[in-house]
Amino acid sequence: MLFLSAPLLAQAPAIEDPAHNELRALRDGLQDAIRKGDIERELSYLHPNVIVTWQNAEVSRGRDGVRKYLERMLNGPAKIVKAYRSEVTVDELTALYGSTTGISYGSSHEHLDLMTGTSVDFTARWSATLIKEDGKWLIANLHASSNLFDNPMLAMAKQMSYIIGGVCLLAGVALGFLLGRRRKAAR
């Protein structure tokens, strides 16, 4: 009898750690705050001593550092980004280390409307270290990056180099034609 029940026992689903629902709530709350442009609410999901490495390789330390970065990029007099959207996907459940530390990673689909009028869509990768402090999960470290060899900024630079090259070629042909005509007229 025990032999017959072994396959049933092997198929029993693993019990998921309740921490994962708490972490999903953090993710959903943070995404909602980002969608609404609520910087102060975004900061409430970050540890006071958070370290964030942004896509442009800038590093912000602490909630104040993150606030300054976001204000400068999104709201300041010299802001760079007019509008921002992001959809975050987690690759798998957070790897938990004990009951108060976790590491999560995944991808995000980003859309930026820049102040220059350019819109940029790209996929990024991210990783985060999360800690549970006073019963609440917080992001202690966040790192975001994009593909160095295949990204929209590189594509725009490549396109611009083709345009500039074409304009220079046409200008060179026109200048050569004009100089050639001048020499003929001088004879």
Regions flagged by a language model, labelled:
Residues 36-54, 61:
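Short, well-ordered alpha-helical segments enriched in acidic and aromatic residues
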Residues 5-7:
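N-terminal signal peptide c-region/cleavage motif recognized by signal peptidases
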Residues 10-40, 44, 157-165, 169-187:
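Short, low-complexity N-terminal intrinsically disordered segments enriched in polar/charged residues
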Residues 55, 64-118:
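Surface-exposed, charged secondary-structure patches
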Residues 46, 56, 106-108, 126-128, ...:
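A mature extracytoplasmic/lumenal domain signature
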Residues 11, 123-154:
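Short beta-strand edge/turn micro-motifs at domain boundaries
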